[in-house]
Each structure stands twice: as structure tokens, then as C-alpha cells.
Amino acid sequence: MILIDTNIIMYAAGAPHPNKQPSVRLLERIASGEIEATINTETLQEILHRYRAIKRWNDGRQVYDLARQIFPVVISVTAEHLDSARKLLDAYSGLMARDALHAALLIDEKFESIYSYDRDFDKIAGVRRVQP
């Protein structure tokens, strides 16, 4: 199984950018069943938070609903994932908490890789990042 980082969804939904079309194509391949991938509950929370913070709630609602349509099964973040994230934060200075949580879930659940544009994942042992 492959984990999809929030930035893939945000680029696909966002304004023109070099990462937009590769993100759209990846999500289309996932939606068609060509690639088996999922997201976690933190990804959905990040979508809600970001669009509310930038006062674009109507867009945020649509992006959230599309994510739920593409990813009907969402992995729940547990206290154990948070415990693992805390350990990663101890081990990697400069690592952001949300990235640590995604990485911890990926490692704990033995995911194959994470699709992301965030190079911070490259520093973490046990995490394989793939850029679309």
C-alpha cells in the first residue's frame, strides 16, 4: 500500500503550478484502481484546516469531498502512531510534527512508500518517498 501526502491533493486542486498535472494524473490513476493507495485522517484534517485558514471554505469542502471519494478507506491515526511520531521528532531535528506523523504511520503500518513533494521525508530511515 502507498500513502498519499496532503500536498499531492492540494497541488491537484490548486492553481497552475508545475506539480499540478503530475498530481492530477496520480490521483486519476488511484481513482481508476491502477494504483492502490490511501490517506490518513491527518490528511483530511490538513485539508479542512488549510482551506478554513485561507478563508476558502467552499473550495475546501469540495477538495475534502473529492478526497473522500478517491479514498473511501482512510487510515485512522492512533495514539501509537503519535508515540512513534514523537520518537521521530526526537531523532530528526527540523522535522515538522505533521510530517513526523505521516512518516510514523507509514513505518508502523509497513506502507511501501509515500507519494509527496516534501523532501523532508528523504531524511527519515524507513521512509521511501516517491515524487509523481
Q: Residue spans of the language-model regions?
A:
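Acidic, PIN/NYN-like endoribonuclease modules and their adjacent C-terminal/linker elements
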Residues: 1, 103-104, 108-132
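Short, well-structured N-terminal submotif of metal-dependent ribonuclease cores
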Residues: 1-39, 52-62
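Histidine- and aromatic-rich ligand-binding microenvironments
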Residues: 5, 39-40, 95-96, 118, ...
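Active-site phosphate/pyrophosphate-handling residues
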Residues: 7, 42, 100-104
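A generic structural signal for short hydrophobic patches within well-formed alpha-helices
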Residues: 9, 44, 121-122
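Structured helix-beta-strand junction loops
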Residues: 32-34, 70, 91, 124
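Active-site neighborhoods of divalent-metal-dependent phosphate/nucleic-acid chemistry enzymes
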Residues: 73-115
